[in-house]
Amino acid sequence: MKVAIASDHGGVHIRNEIKELMDELQIEYIDMGCDCGSGSVDYPDYAFPVAEKVVSGEVDRGILICGTGIGMSISANKVKGIRCALAHDTFSAKATREHNDTNILAMGERVIGPGLAREIAKIWLTTEFTGGRHQTRIGKISDYEEKNL
């Protein structure tokens, strides 16, 4: 598996924690920033490139972190083919993979701490899509997307 990871200025610390986790899990990743120091940056400038790498197949999944995770999630979901879910608990992280086959995880650094972020990311990275009735539902989303976006 190969993962693209990015954050804005509000998610740098958790981004670094998740990179350490992926090193431990021997998961290959591309760090797509931000290298923002103390400056403020705009989350869409990081969400769109990660989402584009996922839909192009260059990476399998993406992880996005901002202050709340909301802006990253909204931005990523504007890219056709993306199923980005915001998760701030382990139950949701697992369900987004098992039931929704999410290809991007969003988290908020101002909402959760680094320990919980690592747990969420580990579960999300190691959980597989269950298919079955959930595949039918994903298919309906994809059909709608093809017709309307």
Curated annotation (Swiss-Prot):
Entry's transmembrane regions: none
One GO MF term attached to the UniProt entry: ribose-5-phosphate isomerase activity
EC number: 5.3.1.-
Pfam families per UniProt: LacAB_rpiB (PF02502)
Keywords assigned: Isomerase
Annotated Gene3D superfamilies: Sugar-phosphate isomerase, RpiB/LacA/LacB
UniProt induction comment: Negatively regulated by TnrA under nitrogen-limited conditions.
GO biological process: D-allose catabolic process; pentose-phosphate shunt, non-oxidative branch
Alphabetized InterPro entries for the sequence: RpiB (IPR004785), RpiB_LacA_LacB (IPR003500), RpiB_LacA_LacB_sf (IPR036569), SPI_LacAB/RpiB (IPR051812)
Residues involved in substrate binding: 9, 67-72, 133
Active site, per annotation: 66 (proton acceptor), 99 (proton donor)
Cross-referenced SUPFAM superfamilies: Ribose/Galactose isomerase RpiB/AlsB
Keyword check for Isomerase: yes
Top EC class, one word: isomerase
Family to which the UniProt record says this protein belongs: Belongs to the LacAB/RpiB family.
Name by which UniProt lists this protein: Putative sugar phosphate isomerase YwlF
Species whose genome carries this gene: Bacillus subtilis (strain 168)
Origin organism lineage: Bacteria, Bacillati, Bacillota, Bacilli, Bacillales
Encoding gene per record: ywlF
